Amino acid sequence: MRANEQKIASDGYEVCMFPCECMFLNVNRPEHDVYGLDFLPVTAQGAPMTHMPVYAPFTGTIVYTGNDHNCILQSNNKVHTPSGLKYVRVLVAHSDNSPPAVTSEFRQGFQYYTTGDYGYSFGEHLHMEYAILDDPNAQKWNTGGIGLYGGCHMWDALYVDDTFLARPGSYNWLLFGETPPVPGEDTKKKRGFPWYIKNRMFRCKR
């Protein structure tokens, strides 16, 4: 997504978006281990940078801050995701700046975070995790305190409209309006962002 971008569907609900202008995946992990993904700081054209802006993927409120300058932003209302109309939480970590205070509110598209190298980190990056929920008052963490409650694959929580896909990995990233794969379907040959969409987005003038 782009700075100050707001994407609202025809029913009035926001669309959950990838929160940066460029996606450059740090490590392409096996699918069973990708509830948390790391992204490197790059410009909208894919060039290295420092302190890459991170925009609110939806209008929401900070509901948690903790170690590694991490924080959780929760949507104020249900938003469109590839999994349906859900409440969404996103955990981000490692900014060099202190996270926003709990109860801080951010409009979709507003910058609320940056990449960094703070805490348990091995180079500047953005660590990010998503959870999708039906109940906005649900617990924040899984039993044992590791991992977001309701955690999910990132491509099941957001869309990548208006994001430059420099290194997206081989995952099912979708544009809003596309149909997610059928659960249980053999997607090995289909896995990955469609080449024709990727090519069109790479050629798009920014």
Briefly describe each language-model feature range:
Residues 123-131:
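Histidine-centered catalytic micro-motifs
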Residues 46-49, 96-100:
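Short alpha-helix capping/helix-loop boundary micro-motifs
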Residues 131-168:
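Short peripheral tails and domain-boundary helices/loops at the edges of structured domains
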Residues 99-110:
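Acidic, glycine-anchored pre-beta loop/turn
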Residues 188-206:
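Enriched but not universal
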Residues 1-74, 78-81, 107-108, 117, ...:
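Surface-exposed, glycine-biased beta-strand/turn segments
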Residues 61-63, 93-96:
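Conserved positions in beta-strands of structured domains
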